[in-house]
């Protein structure tokens, strides 16, 4: 009789668990990553099966789009990265000769020249592949507004690249 009661209890528990609404079992975060955009809004420059992946680390580009950079090799191959960290790795460690570097403007989501961008370095928003966040803006006024709200320092590309190199070699 004890075995029957035990089996009946186990069966009832399994039946109860199996009928539970699974959507309430695992609450979903109401906040997406700051870096993320819908795939339909991401400008992807690479061709082929892995066009949505960073060429260095493989991370999903729409997920980390607001920190994405693009470049071309001397032979004209277009490459896209999830972060400046991966650009530095490709350029400095892999010795890939990169030209025509661009970065995503955090506000418009368009690609702009890294040399015309204003980077906010070290804001409270999360970085990609680094503890020190780096977000780019087409207009200095937009970078200043972002830095005022989320902290960080407004820098040009060369200074931001130097910070990223130091982060990479820690």
Model-derived segments and their meaning:
Residues 1-8:
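Bacterial N-terminal signal peptides that target proteins for export
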Residues 54-57:
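Short cysteine-rich clusters marking metal-coordination/redox-active sites
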Residues 20-22:
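Bacterial signal peptide processing site
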Residues 51:
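Residues immediately within or flanking Cys/His clusters that coordinate Zn2+
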Residues 60-61, 89:
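Cys/His-rich metal-chelating microdomains
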Residues 72-111:
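Mid-length scaffold segments of soluble, non-membrane domains
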């Amino acid at each position: 009789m004890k075995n029957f009661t035990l089996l009946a209890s186990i069966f009832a528990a399994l039946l109860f668990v199996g009928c539970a609404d699974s959507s309430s079992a695992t609450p979903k975060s109401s906040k997406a990553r700051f870096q993320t955009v819908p795939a339909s809004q991401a400008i992807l420059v690479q061709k082929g099966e892995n066009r949505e992946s960073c060429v260095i680390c493989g991370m999903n580009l729409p997920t980390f789009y607001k920190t994405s950079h693009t470049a071309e090799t001397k032979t004209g191959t277009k490459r896209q990265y999830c972060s400046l960290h991966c650009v530095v790795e490709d350029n400095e460690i892999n010795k890939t000769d990169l030209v025509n570097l661009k970065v995503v403007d955090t506000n418009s989501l368009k690609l702009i020249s890294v040399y015309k961008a204003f980077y906010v370095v070290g804001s409270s928003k999360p970085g990609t592949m680094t503890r020190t966040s780096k977000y780019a803006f087409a207009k200095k006024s937009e970078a200043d507004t972002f830095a005022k709200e989320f902290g960080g320092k407004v820098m040009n590309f060369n200074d931001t690249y130097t910070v990223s190199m130091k982060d990479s070699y820690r």
